[in-house]
Amino acid sequence: QQWPPGHHIPP
C-alpha cells in the first residue's frame, strides 16, 4: 500500500 511522506503506517 502507498503511504504519503511522513505518514504513520498502522500495524
UniProtKB/Swiss-Prot annotation:
GO MF annotation terms: peptidase inhibitor activity; toxin activity
Cell membrane is among the record's keywords: no
Spans through the membrane: none
GO cellular component: extracellular region
UniProt tissue specificity: Expressed by the venom gland.
Entry keyword set: Hypotensive agent, Metalloenzyme inhibitor, Metalloprotease inhibitor, Protease inhibitor, Pyrrolidone carboxylic acid, Secreted, Toxin
Primary site of residence: secreted
GO BP terms, alphabetized: regulation of blood pressure
Subcellular compartments: Secreted
Pyrrolidone carboxylic acid modified-residue sites: Q1
Role noted for this protein: This peptide both inhibits the activity of the angiotensin-converting enzyme (ACE) and enhances the action of bradykinin by inhibiting the peptidases that inactivate it. It acts as an indirect hypotensive agent.
Family to which this protein belongs: Belongs to the bradykinin-potentiating peptide family.
The name this protein goes by in its record: Bradykinin-potentiating peptide 11a
